[in-house]
Amino acid sequence: MAPEKIILTDTHCHLDFADFDQDRELVISRAREAGLERILNPGTDLTTSRAALKLAEQNDEIYAAVGVHPNSALSWNGDTGGELEELASHPKAKAIGEIGLDYYRKGAPIEVQRTVFTAQLSLAAKMGLPVIIHNRDACEDVMGMLNGWVDELKKNNSKLVDRPGVLHSFSGNLAMAEWAVERNFFIGLTG
């Protein structure tokens, strides 16, 4: 029996950011040559979520995540949830993210971040899409909010219970890592 092929995937890169304006195609080409078969490009607001989808449409191996980063939470308004839902229905949208809480930079007041995070967790459940979680100095609150979300997923027999998402750029402690693994989250490590 032949061994299973390993599919290399970059689960978090912001290829639509201006940092790549001069060499984006070269970066994508080098990723292909290195054997990377899938790239997930998360949005941080509506504009970058649209850009992530556009890049995904232009490249077979690139997929998008759509979401509002906690430091962009002040951009959330009455239309944002509906616009994100529309973007999330695109066939190349594979996750809701990058979402979560950031108590280090505090680009938005904590209560605003929590409200926006909750709205996006609800959207992920509705759309059946996993989440990409940003957590900076907010471990207890992130775990508490995700506990409630995972409990709702279980109550509703959601397939997301098996793989609810990834804790991006994990900086928590061992207890949080164990908590995440017990709830089937992937843990993303910064390289």
Task: Kindly give the residue locations of the regions a language model identified.
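Mid-domain alpha/beta scaffold segments of enzyme catalytic cores
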Residues: 1-191
